[in-house]
Amino acid sequence: MNLIEKIEQEEVARLSANKVLPSFAPGDTVVVSVNVVEGTRKRTQAFEGVVIAKRNRGLNSSFIVRKISSGEGVERTFQTYSPLIASVEVKRRGDVRRAKLYYLRDRSGKSARIKEKLQARVKPTAAVAAE
């Protein structure tokens, strides 16, 4: 491991120590709370949409969230370890077969929907079934 990789690893550890990001994947619907500074006021702004891409590059990791606002598609790229991100909340898990969902840009309406990932049912064990 060279010096740059070591420094990046330490920086990632320092930035993620005070903030816990949930694990999410492309297809998931997330709410990203962003700290916005307007003049002297500081407030939190929520951006809810579908994760269409995720880029894992250590300190340079990022993800793209897409939403439809007043009939217009809006995409926003967030740096994963940015201090401007207050929190990330996963609303629903999407069941997709691709890592990059750029094809959603060309679709609208029902064809742009993403199926929800269902949790696997746990089979009861023989001991529990015997009772």
Swiss-Prot record:
User: Could you provide one GO biological process annotation from this protein's UniProt record?
Assistant: translation
Q: Which SUPFAM superfamilies match?
A: Translation proteins SH3-like domain
The entry's keywords:
Ribonucleoprotein, Ribosomal protein
Q: Which GO terms describe its cellular component?
A: cytosolic large ribosomal subunit
- A GO MF label: structural constituent of ribosome
The entry sums up its family as follows: Belongs to the bacterial ribosomal protein bL19 family.
Record's function text: This protein is located at the 30S-50S ribosomal subunit interface and may play a role in the structure and function of the aminoacyl-tRNA binding site.
Q: What is this protein called?
A: Large ribosomal subunit protein bL19
* Organism in which the protein naturally occurs: Polynucleobacter necessarius subsp. necessarius (strain STIR1)
Gene name on record? Answer: rplS
